[in-house]
Curated annotation (Swiss-Prot):
Family: Belongs to the methyltransferase superfamily. tRNA (adenine-N(6)-)-methyltransferase family.
Molecular functions (GO terms): nucleic acid binding; tRNA (adenine-N6)-methyltransferase activity
UniProt protein name: tRNA1(Val) (adenine(37)-N6)-methyltransferase
Protein's cellular compartments: Cytoplasm
Enzyme class at the top of the EC tree: transferase
Species the sequence originates in: Salmonella typhi
């Protein structure tokens, strides 16, 4: 879908090359997912796994960023969200590359005979506590159905030796997630701390882990400048996706 041919619609988010409907998904398209999909390293990637795809946002972004020969498997537990992801994929330029699986990743992963160079997830991060408005939203937001230790273990079983496992998390939770990953034998290779503007402390962190040891590259990304417009660095990262950048 070209920019000139794109139509703004109310039930989702219009990007330059695709549209993501999310009205039947517990978690809507947001800055976290867009950041992660634009940031994850894709050089030499041959196969991608999206854990908890929701609306299919990350799978679609990564399909746009990678070669047409790269398959993307997107796994989603919630049947309603998975159906909407399938519809979003069907209307995108990449229906031949993205496969949406309606399944629990804990059941799906052990059945796989191939490994993935890139595994990506915008995971739940709240411990069970205050109830959400719907069971679907609770599932998407809370770790009861997929705790971080289980997620890290599944990724370890599915990844290639030199692959990357990428997540986005709130800053403090990301620090705890990193320590947990290191304790399980992962190596932190990329870290970007994200702040709303220069005056604020980082509120999100983008993390890339690998089974393979190596130098860790760290930086900071500010979303908005002092004029409240998107910063140059945020624009450079996401302009291939945002419709009016």
């Amino acid at each position: 879908m070209s920019q000139s041919g794109s139509v703004l619609r109310r039930n989702g988010f219009t990007f330059k090359q695709f549209f993501v409907a999310h009205d039947r998904c517990a978690m809507k398209v947001g800055t976290d997912g867009i950041l992660l999909g634009a940031w994850a390293p894709v050089a030499d990637v041959k196969r991608i796994l999206d854990i908890g795809t929701g609306s299919g946002l990350l799978a679609l972004m990564l399909a746009q960023r990678t070669d047409d020969s790269v398959p993307v498997d997107a796994v989603e537990l919630d049947a309603g969200a998975a159906m909407q992801a399938q519809e979003n994929v069907a209307h995108s330029p990449w229906p031949h590359r993205i496969t949406v699986h309606t399944d629990d990743i804990q059941r799906w992963a052990p059945r796989q005979t191939v490994r993935f160079d890139l595994i990506i997830s915008n995971p739940p991060y709240y411990e069970p506590g205050v109830e959400c408005s719907t069971p679907q939203r609770e599932q998407a937001r809370y770790t009861a159905t997929l705790d971080h230790q289980t997620l890290l273990a599944i990724a370890a079983d599915c990844i290639t030796e030199d692959g990357f496992f990428c997540v986005v998390l709130p800053e403090q939770i990301g620090n705890a997630f990193t320590q947990q990953a290191l304790n399980m034998g992962w190596h932190l290779r990329l870290r970007t701390d994200v702040a709303e503007n220069e005056a604020r402390l980082p509120h999100r962190v983008l993390l890339a882990f690998s089974p393979q040891a190596g130098e860790c590259f760290s930086d900071r990304l500010v979303i908005r400048g002092s004029d409240q417009n998107y910063s140059e660095s945020y624009t450079a990262l996401t302009q291939a996706f945002y419709l009016f950048m």
